[in-house]
Amino acid sequence: MTVKTVQDSPAQYAFLDFMADCVIHVDQRVTGQVATRRLIVVKYRGSGYGRNEYPFIIGENGINVIPITSNVLQHRSPGPQVSSGQPQLDGVLGGGYKRGTSVLLAGSPGAGKTTLACVFAKAACLRGERVLYLNFEESPESLVSNMLSPGIVLAPLIKTGRLVIQSYLPEAMGAEEHLFHALNTLDEVHPQHMVVDAISACNRMGSEQAAFEYLMRVLNACKERGITCFYLNQAIGPDVVAEISGIGISSIIDTVVVLSQLSIGGSMKRQLIVMKSRGSKHSDRFHEYRITDRGIDLVKA
């Protein structure tokens, strides 16, 4: 039996709740001009059902319900370290990034977050691994073109299928639909590594809470599959360290690298520091670096 409720009159057919064995309430709400469908199981006699609200989408394959949270964490143990693609940075990190962990690259515009991520992606592809790159800020063609300046050639990697770049406008759909596409792509591509550029754009999916839930679910999916997950965040405040993630997920990230820019003597200098890297003996110093036509070079102290 289906019943249409009237807004502001939830008790219009209240007597049906007592008659039915199972009651499911579905609705559609609009937050920040982004529509989201959600359902909640109000009652289900004789069943230990989930009591939270769950987002769902209606697609060509019918209804897809995407639980945001899970009662049990089933993350795989971190694997061996893999190179960042930059030998000097590997030394700063204590040997590189650990496979299957989460990495946050945070910094102001122009600091080199995308460049650093693409250096890693290229190195991984050349090792024969697959990388999924989700971009919320520029098209695949634009990314490939812009990376030519620091000498990072991505086009051949895309042709071989080792690098898969997908671009979406955050506000084009709700967080649940973005999540559905991300999880589907993970199952289709089977990457060893994933990059999300940038998480600061995810707020445009409807709300900060929706962005947080999306990023948490993607992170959990990656850790369950043993996929290294890179999050890039654009810090817009004057204190980059204070705005590491902007969405409140930095505490669950395994490795945090902060990139900053300083104006010294009339010129702009860039520096990075590894704020934390679980399970590794990383450097605790600031390291100056330059973006050249050969990628990223760390300046010797």
Language-model regions: role of each:
Residues 4-9, 29-32, 45-48, 60-63, ...:
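Conserved nucleotide-binding/hydrolysis micro-motifs of P-loop NTPases
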Residues 84, 89-117, 161, 166-168, ...:
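Flexible loop/N-cap segments at domain edges
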Residues 1-5, 210-237:
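Substrate-engagement module of ASCE P-loop NTPases
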Residues 29-83, 87, 180, 187-189, ...:
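Conserved P-loop NTPase
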Residues 92-154:
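Walker A/P-loop NTP-binding active-site region of P-loop NTPases
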Residues 129-213:
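Conserved inter-motif catalytic segment of the P-loop NTP-binding fold
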Residues 9-12, 203-212, 241-243:
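Conserved ATPase-coupling elements of RecA-like P-loop NTPase cores
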Residues 113, 135, 192, 196, ...:
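Glycine-rich phosphate-binding loops of nucleotide-dependent enzymes
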